[in-house]
């Protein structure tokens, strides 16, 4: 703990929201406010399911507990502690998931007609924000690893070219890392953006642990980025839907708060906020040790899975100094096509036959998300199951597709296409038309098609193949994705 104590200005042993809730619990306040379950008394089934400890602190904003929309006491203290722990100028507690963090980032820096430079393999929340604000994407289409079929990071020269050709762009957005653990050269991209008078934003939905792990890729704040969206619930241990928005010294926190309050709830969940508070404390005090163990577990799993044969659990050997500048070694991503199975097929078999739930399976890969709650015995069970799946279900792989990412042809801005007059056509009749809605596999939530992109035969083949293999498809108005909305 002494090493950690030297890293922080504030007392990271504190958890102000949690402490305030504990004080409130002892006060025995009579509730004539919302929520209507009145500390669980009005909904005994819910109380029996979640427990009195939980529903007893599902409370509304009040003076002793502060207000998320305008924090002045315990929430403000919790945000100051989070900023200190993550090396940011300011931090905001977010209760709408990292989707709300990402959208707040984009809405802070972009207005209608502004250009923003970004990779096309972004989460849908980024493109949702462009629909809302009317900004225009300047895509840096990433390279694809031919063996794995996955998109890589942005090359430095690609970003430099985009900045040179679009000098009026307001920001560059970077994935740090991608879902698969791929990192771009963030420090170099931050410098290029700043030299051109642009801000640099980082989607760090999968990079919470970068702030607390030795030997892991550089975090956005350490690289000098201006804003970063951090999914504390993914690898940091907080409750699902809780997140952080971090900002650097070049961004005005008061304006960011106004942007957040445009879309975030006025009834912030104290369950989510206290989970952020407690998890931040845990990471500040023990994060380095814990994530060192997580990285060791993932490395062990990679070695064991590769020893099985047929699978390829990839890691730092992908690094090439540019489009794969670094790799997140806690990510256990496994290529499955060489055993004749799509990633989504292995995903389904693991759940249905072995009671193992992994993060996702796509066309050619699976991802097992290792974090602070995993233990070696579960890793052993996963390795054993994969070995048995190879023995029981291996095929010759005839007819398998390999490529995850297809470069889009952009014909209109996301906002223009989303709100334009549209018509619904059978899927196969949409070739050559401009899409007006999203189509994606979820997870990972990276659009196959976004509003404003031209529909190609290759994309239609991919959609039909993904549906046939059992990928969970979301986005279109037609839930069966037999029809797509296109510009009229």
Which residue ranges define each predicted feature?
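N-terminal "arm"/small-domain region of PLP-dependent enzymes with the aminotransferase-like
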Residues: 1-73, 444
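Conserved PLP-anchoring active-site segment centered on the Schiff-base-forming lysine
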Residues: 110-127
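Hydrophobic beta-strand scaffold residues
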Residues: 137, 200-201, 358
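Active-site phosphate-binding strand-loop segment of PLP-dependent enzymes
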Residues: 148-209
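Active-site PLP attachment segment
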Residues: 219-258, 264-275
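Structural signature of PLP-dependent enzymes
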Residues: 279-302, 378
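Conserved C-terminal alpha-helix-loop-beta "cap" of PLP-dependent enzymes
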Residues: 300-475
